[in-house]
Amino acid sequence: MEPTGNPANPGLTPSGHVDTFARDHLPPRERWPVLVHDRPELHYPDRLNCGAELLDRSAERFGAERPAFHAPSGETWTYGTLREHVDRIAHVLTGELGVRPGQRVLLRGPTTPWLAACWLAVMKAGAVAVTVLAQQRSQELATMCEIAEVRHALCDIRSVDDLIKAGVPGLSVTTYGGEGPDDLLARAARHPGRYEAVDTAADDVALIAFTSGTTGRPKGCMHFHRDVLAIADTFARHILKPVPDDVFAGSPPLGFTFGLGGLVIFPLRFGASSVLLEQAGPKQLLPAIGRYGITVLFTAPTAYRTMLDQLDAHDVSSLRRCVSAGENLPAATWQAWHQRTGHRVINGIGATELLHIFISAADDAIRPGTTGRPVPGWHARVVDDSGAPVPDGEPGLLAVRGPVGCRYLADDRQLQYVRHGWNVTGDTYVRDPDGYFRYVARADDMIISAGYNVAGPEVEEALLRHPDVAETAVVGRPDELRGQIVVAYVVPREGARPDADRLREFVKGELVPYKCPREIVFLDALPRTATGKLQRFRLRTQPPQEPGP
């Protein structure tokens, strides 16, 4: 097959795509970060289809009879069953729907084995998966479809209304989980259970993952087939160290790269299985651990803290790895979980732009209060605004590079994220002299009050040490005299009635006085995205309130 001939990106392997939109809209090569493949496990062949690697090769290596996915219905799909379903769906995509290699296919629905099968089918068909969340609304969906020029969608029948409401011109929507001969699953049943994966290049785009877009137009992050394997061959291989008998589960949805990696890519890469829960809050996760013998758990810090109050009624003895990401893991939460369960929570920082976690630590290498060290295969440093490294112990911007990098789809914000060959994530960090990286705040979340720098997460950590506090978020509010003042929003623990003045006195006993919140506001819940990330910007825009009781 001939190369696409995109002059902005010479040196790419000849593409397996017929529709070259994704490759044609990669940033010019000079705007890419430096990509590093300095470990043997990251040396991939030029021709690579990640769907075939994750499914076909794993079935051959570990056995088609091994379990792959478990569903709350009690049904278990083996690798062989999964392969048959995936291959039949791939036949529908290419034989009935006319999907050509390189075309974008939007995937939408709650976390189920069928959604995972659709993703794998898109991979094997050589198309590009556009992963979205079941909770995203019509306007968001319309914008994403416009950016990625989506013309095909596979959608759970329960999640189709907002997609139809989006009114995307020329969009062909095929639903699954319904009734009738036109349902995807009915169509798939009429096709053979074997499909030869399209001969894609390792550097063909496999998926477009959109950032949340909470502060502006969503950014589409384009990732290659080799990138999908690279996150498994770095974080999963070296930090999680999976074995075929592992059972993965977690709260992040498959439309979120944290969930796609933790619940589909990682277990399939290593012959393990995963429990795909449609409802995966703390109340559902805890009983599922004992029921399925879950060994590897992925969820957010807030969930770990919430589960602490319910642990006594559940058996969590099967757990081997507990992973936290999505937001900073407070040391108080880490200590409380460790004391109750004996498990050391694996902290980590990842990004949609880099697909998954790139700084972390496990077992005896964990240091509570730090994120960890660069995962093998990744490199990180702390820099100033000019890109120059800052001395250990001084705060600066986190800069990262490794086998995966930021490549926005036709978006000038590429110039902000990639600087001097490094991915600059927008997080403020300190590197300790022993090489551990310590989170300070999002760069735009630093509070400057009367000339003092205050990191909101540090104040949050102090508040979380108070027994009456379940959750908290600390932001800066504009103030004529001080520039900004520190404001804390607090969700009380169930049954508690904390007093604002006493909380302030408690914080003064933990931190220097200028970091103490001048206002404390009590809320029933903090604003979060569909993936559970805290939306601090919504708190910053709230009008001043009377201090809490």
Q: What do these predicted ranges mean?
A:
Residues 294-299, 308-367, 379:
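Gly/Ser/Thr-rich phosphate-binding loop
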Residues 78-80, 199, 206-230:
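Conserved AMP-binding A3 loop
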Residues 373-377, 388-420, 434, 452-454:
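Conserved ATP/PPi-binding loop(s) of AMP-dependent carboxylate-activating enzymes
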